[in-house]
Amino acid sequence: MAKIVIIGAGAMGTAFALPCLDNNHDINIVGTHLENDFIEELKNSNNLHPGLNTQIPQEIKIFKFEKFEELLKSNVDLIVLGISSKGIEWVSDQLSKLYKSTKIPKLLMLTKGLSVYNNQYELLVDKLERLLAEREIKKVDISAVGGPCLAT
């Protein structure tokens, strides 16, 4: 059983958690700094996720941002990035603060899209790798999901 932390409590990150649970992994979802109110509403609605119209099983633990550092420092096997494309810089800052002196766990990026860097298109997974390297986090094992995406 792998210990997986998903960053982002939106539809994509939460939808990804369900098959992970089906495969007997230990799943923790931690919201970003922008999702505390959303997570509170989720807990008040008996874990009914409004974006998925699905009841999230109690075995999937959902935390507010205040638990971010604690969860990511707890022998994680895989960090899943279920954040928007606008959050790539933010998450690279957060990860580089936490893993400055230790090896970063494997990353799986659910975020898809392109950005522009030096007047050329750049895949978001390449952007993340570049931003982490600029912050002294090198030799990162990053995988990315491809294809169309609707988390419903």
Residue ranges and their predicted role:
Residues S74, L78-T152:
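Rossmann-like NAD(P)(H) cofactor-binding subdomain of soluble oxidoreductases
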Residues D22-N24, I56-P57, T102, I137-K139:
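Short, well-ordered coil/turn elements that cap or connect secondary structure elements
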Residues M1-T54, I60-F65, E70, Y117:
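NAD(P)+-binding Rossmann beta1-loop-alpha1 motif at the extreme N-terminus of oxidoreductases
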